[in-house]
Amino acid sequence: RKATAIALASVMAMSLAACGKQDGSNQGGQTEQKEYVYVPEYLELDDNTNSSYSNMTVQGDKLYYTNYQWDEASGESKVVIGAYSLTDGSREDLPITINADGGGIYSMQADAEGNIYTAEFEWNATEGDDAYTQQTTVLHKYDASGTELMAQDITDIMQQDENNSYVGSMCLDDQGRFYISSDSLIRLFGSDGQFQGAVQTDSQWIQGMGKAKDGKVYLAYYDQSGNVKLSQIDFDGKALGQTYDNFPNTNGNGGLCAGIDNDLLVNTDTALYDYSLADQKTTEILSWL
C-alpha cells in the first residue's frame, strides 16, 4: 500500500489557553484575549494504485483534487477527480474520469454549486511518428453528477502565441469566467468558454493567480526589474489594475487563494502567508519547515 500525504489547502486554528485560566478571565476580572497559532493539517491517503495528487482547490467545505492513477497490470492511466469534506473527513471520487493516456488536466476549479471546471489537454500522435506532435486544449464544465455542461476547444487561441501556448494556471471569478495564465499573458474566456481577449502583463514571469476574499482575481508576477508585484486583473478592461507591493515570492507555486483574516492566503516553498491589500502587508501564518 502506498501512503500519500496531502497538505490541506486550509489550516487549523488551535487556541492556546492561558495557564490555569479555563474560564477565559484574568485575575483583574477582565476578559483575557486568547491567542491562536495556525498549524498545517495533513490528510493521509492510502491507495492500492500508483497515484499522484495535484490541482487542489477549496470551495466551501470541500477540498477538491485530481488523482492521477496508473494501473501497472494493464499499463493504462486515468485522472480521477476527488473531494474531501473539511467538516466530517469523508472522501469521494466524483463521477468524472479523464483518460490520461495521451492527455490530462492542466488545471481545475470548483464553484459553490459543486460544478467542476477543467482545462484539459490531449496529445494526438501523427501516424508514423513516435512522439506526440499535436496538442489540443479544451475548457470543460461538469456538474456534480458528472454531466458535461460545456466543452470549448481553445487550441487555436492558445497557439496564436508560441511563447504563451500552454496553460500555466486557471482561475474563475464569481461570474464563472475563466482566467488562464501562460508565461507572460493572461487569456480571458466567458462562462461559456468563448474567448474575450487577453491581458499583456509585460512580465518576466507570472508566478501565480488566485481569487481574493473580495471575489476578484489577482495576479502575482515579476516586473521587469525582477521585483514581485501583485495586480488585480480587470476582465472588462482587459488590463491589469492597481499594483500592490510587499508581496511574498511564491517561487512559481502559484499558491494564492481567498484569505481568512485578510484578503489573500499565499503559499510558498517554506511558509504560508496572509496578505492585506489595504495595508500591502504580509504576515507569516506558519512555516512548512
Describe each model-derived feature in a short phrase:
Residues 50-58, 101-112, 160-173, 203-212, ...:
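Repeated scaffold domains used in trafficking and secretory/extracellular systems
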Residues 15-18:
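C-terminal motif of bacterial Sec signal peptides marking the signal peptidase cleavage site
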Residues 65-66, 118-120, 180, 219-220, ...:
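Residue position within the beta-strands of beta-propeller blades
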Residues 43-79:
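Beta-strand-rich domains and repeat architectures in extracellular enzymes and scaffolds
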Residues 39-47, 90-98, 148-161, 194-200, ...:
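A short beta-strand motif characteristic of beta-propeller blades
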Residues 85-89, 142-147, 189-194, 234-238, ...:
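Short loop/turn segments that connect beta-strands within beta-propeller blades
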Residues 72-78, 125-135, 181, 222-227:
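Short, solvent-exposed loop/turn segments at conserved positions within beta-propeller repeat blades
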Residues 20-22:
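Bacterial signal peptide processing site
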